[in-house]
């Protein structure tokens, strides 16, 4: 949980969050850093843990390990796979079994990692994942990895597929240790946690000038005006609750391949499957947890051969209902508007178009 901070090097420099984001105005510690100091910040972060950030690979970006600031793209829009891959592994063994020795739970021994350059939508998605994997029934693997992660957010410019503004996730109020806002000739740093404050001690930072704070406010207003897509998010509960059997879905269901790509790239999809494997000698085995997708026919298959979502249509509508729900802990929608499902859909199905079209047909 974020702890609001009081001072930096003995100076009180609380600054109220900007009124452009009036939903949760609090008081955070703001500092200004020249861009020539970024390399020194990276070195400080390297001392905390292994560095990971947005690296361009071909046409797309991926969160990968990096050593130099020159290896990452600070102007990226989105990665293909979200940062959840660091906390819920796509595939991992969680238990080993031996016929004579019994079973052994495989404990996590994570290294400390720094995730540098996360955008607000992904930070808000991680808050949702935290509420699922930590708040009620803690998952020891996830929780330990989160404890050993340091989150550095980075401001971004939306492209034509971003709709996080419609979902209320275009700004991160918490969920990070540090957040960097690019104001052209410098960065404004919002400090989110005590350990974030401790890490930046010794850097050449200063209290932001009035001119710098005006640049920050202006850049946030400009960014807010750049979103092209708009989802009628106030109607999402109605879509989820009452439109399951509407014929308005049919056009998109017919185009859908049922491949599950949208769930794999979604930063809040968290379904997994647990399987057990035994060696041919029948003496050794292990239990494996891996990502699953509600778009796959096997996902809803239960004992006796019953499948409670047997058709692609059932699975298609189910996913949109799931993403339209609101997380009761964070009060955020399960869709954070990152645009990944649209960008990486092989059938070119547009998430916003689907929901706006369905609502438009029946309203």
Question: Which ranges hold each PLM region?
Answer:
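Oxyanion-binding "anion nests"
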Residues: 231-239, 256-267
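Histidine- and/or cysteine-centered catalytic micro-motif in compact active-site loops
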Residues: 194, 261, 267-274, 299
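Iron-sulfur-associated redox domains of electron-transfer enzymes in respiratory
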Residues: 2-240
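Functionally engaged cysteine thiol sites
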Residues: 155-169, 269-275, 283, 294
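Active-site-flanking alpha-helical
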Residues: 126, 267-271, 346
């Amino acid at each position: 949980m974020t702890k609001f901070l009081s001072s930096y090097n003995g100076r009180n420099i609380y600054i109220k969050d900007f009124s452009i984001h009036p939903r949760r105005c609090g008081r955070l510690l703001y500092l200004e850093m020249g861009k020539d100091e970024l390399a020194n910040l990276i070195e400080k972060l390297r001392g905390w843990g292994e560095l990971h950030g947005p690296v361009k690979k071909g046409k797309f970006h991926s969160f990968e390990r990096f050593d130099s600031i020159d290896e990452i793209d600070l102007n990226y829009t989105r990665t293909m796979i979200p940062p959840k891959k660091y906390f819920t592994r796509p595939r991992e063994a969680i238990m080993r079994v031996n016929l004579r020795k019994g079973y052994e739970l495989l404990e996590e021994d994570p290294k400390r990692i720094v995730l540098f350059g996360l955008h607000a939508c992904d930070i808000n998605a991680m808050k949702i994942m935290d509420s699922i994997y930590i708040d009620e029934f803690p998952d020891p693997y996830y929780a330990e990895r989160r404890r050993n992660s340091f989150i550095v957010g980075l401001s971004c410019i939306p492209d034509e597929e971003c709709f996080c503004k419609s979902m209320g996730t275009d700004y991160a109020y918490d969920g990070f240790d540090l957040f960097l806002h690019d104001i052209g000739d410098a960065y404004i740093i919002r400090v989110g946690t005590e350990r974030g404050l401790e890490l930046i001690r010794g850097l050449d930072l200063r209290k932001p000038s009035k001119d710098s704070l005006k640049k920050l406010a202006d850049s946030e207003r400009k960014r807010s005006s750049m979103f092209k897509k708009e989802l009628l998010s106030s109607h999402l509960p109605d879509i989820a609750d009452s439109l399951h059997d509407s014929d308005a879905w049919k056009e998109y269901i017919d185009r859908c391949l049922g491949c599950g790509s949208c769930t794999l790239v979604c930063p809040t999809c968290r379904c997994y499957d647990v399987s057990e494997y035994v060696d041919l000698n029948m003496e050794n085995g292990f239990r494996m947890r891996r990502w699953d997708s509600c778009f796959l026919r096997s996902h809803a298959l239960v004992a006796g051969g019953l499948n409670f979502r047997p058709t692609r249509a059932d699975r298609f509508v189910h996913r949109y209902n799931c993403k339209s729900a609101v997380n009761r802990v964070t009060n955020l929608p399960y869709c954070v508007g990152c645009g990944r499902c649209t960008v990486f859909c092989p059938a070119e199905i547009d998430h916003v178009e689907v929901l706006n079209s369905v609502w438009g047909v029946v309203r």
